[in-house]
Amino acid sequence: MKAFIRRFASNAAKAKQATSRKKLLDKMTVEEMPASSRKFPWVNFKMDREPGKIVLEVKNATIDGGDGIVCKDLTFSLGNQDKVALVGEFDTLKTAFFQLIAEEIKSPEGVLKWGNTISYNYFPKNNDAYFKTDLSLVDWLRQYSKEQDETFIRGFLGRMLFTGEEALKSANVLSGGEKVRCMLSKMMLSNANCLLLDEPTAHLDLEAITALNNGLKAFPGPVIFCSQDHEFVQTIANRVLELTPNGVVDRSITFDEWLETKKTKKK
């Protein structure tokens, strides 16, 4: 409970829950606190090969976030040690950025080139299209696996707490959080050497966020991600890329350092 309060007190979406739990905690004695029965998922990303020095190059691209929100002259390169936090006021612009580099949409101008050694895996913000099927979770995940053995597939589902009969439930009845956990199983299964994640923490509980946080910190390859969870971003990112309608601000700093620069500019 203390971990939840500490992590989400400043999170707009979960601040009320954090406040409520703090009030409950303040009223409880140590003897009254129940033993936790919560289980933690296990997130462990492995790479099929080491990424080359240059992972991705984007030059003079344009992304359209809708409603007249456009970012022009998008130019940056991604190195094999970069863990980039994508930030900015407009969520639609960030999603368009991910769709561009995941090659789901194209820029009307400019160049986008992935390195020859790179295999990337993309976690989209909206994953509903992946689950419009009545396949069991075992068969759903089997679609994305070279290894078809059920025990092997169940191992990746089990990491995200889909064990026993849970692994046989239909993919089209999952909650938002369950869909995210399945997508993370799929991402782990890919063995990609570059990970792209658009708001992966949005529907996760504290245990799953912590597991993903640890998994991305330990991952030796490049990552581009965005999240509303402050601790998640601060402990993973070594570079911040800010998207604005006026262009891109690219800084090799931590998230907290970036926040300080924003405060300084406002003074």
Ranges and model annotations:
Residues F45-K267:
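ABC ATP-binding cassette signature C-motif
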Residues M1-D73, K267:
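Flexible nucleotide-interacting loop at or near the entrance of a catalytic core
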